[in-house]
Amino acid sequence: MKKIKLIAALLSVLFLTGCVDQSGNQSADNDTKEKRIVATSVATCEILDKLEVEGVVGVPKTDSYSIPKRYENAESVGSPMAPDMEIIKSLKPDIVLSPNSLEGELKSQYENIGVESYFLDLKSTEGMYESILALGKILGKEEEAEKLHQEFEDFKNDFAQKHNEQEAPTVLILMGLPGSYVVATESSYVGSLVKLAGGVNVYGDGDGQDFLNINPEDMVEKAPDIILRTSHALPEQVKKMFAEEFATNDIWKHFEAVQNARVYDLDNEKFGMSANFQYEEALKELETFLYQEGTN
């Protein structure tokens, strides 16, 4: 695999490569010249918008989420899962930004079209903010990045103090897909939010796997206090699927969480696949589910 040689101005960001992985075969300078940027996910666009970056020339095609108004005139480069390499190449970007969950699929493709790429850690809120710090250095937005990071640290510390004396509830998280579902672990974004809120995932970090295929018979043995349900896409369709599954599959009647009406459906815009800036609202919503008795 070809190793990138970045010029000296970028060497200061190498300590953050755990958060932003770098690839490609072009060098990029960190001067005052506005870089041409392609962002292949909505979450990445939102980060750039928060950093007040203007040079975005390519954005993902999406029917479910809104692209920041700042980038409404940027070229569509196709779906986040499979961006169009020919369109990206035609835009002559200095940098392409994508989530690191897709690095295995996209890294070699970016190399093949000769563009430099950066992969952001969007698997947790903490990872997102470390990536923001790295991008601040790369894009000359260090002040904005530091401000955002400090705001997150202040919120996180204040939030952690609210329930540190309370018993942590155990939680089962189901991530729905049309026609099926998987278990989300602490390694997933929604799982990281539950952990940040003080919940204990009954499947832990899944040995580093974001999602696990588990049958309900095994889940019931974990005896979760709470069941949370969210979706990867098509939220209304998935919500109906979950309702039918829980109504027709007798195994769910044996869960104390079901018996105690502690099953909650989450908004997939806040509790989706990638970290985003709705984490404050998400944590406050989780707070009501984790620490107060409730009903569906």
What feature does the model see in each segment?
Residues 35-51, 144-197:
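Basic- and aromatic-lined ligand-binding clefts that recognize polyanionic substrates
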Residues 35-36, 129-132, 137-138, 146, ...:
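Structured C-terminal subdomain patch of bacterial secreted/periplasmic proteins
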Residues 1-7:
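Bacterial N-terminal signal peptides that target proteins for export
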Residues 36-91, 95-101, 202:
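A short, structured surface patch at a secondary-structure boundary
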Residues 85-98, 115, 215-229:
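Proline-aspartate-enriched helix->loop->beta-strand connector
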Residues 61-67, 182-211:
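Alpha-helical, coiled-coil/dimerization segments enriched in small aliphatic residues
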Residues 15-18:
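C-terminal motif of bacterial Sec signal peptides marking the signal peptidase cleavage site
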Residues 20-23:
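Bacterial signal peptide processing site
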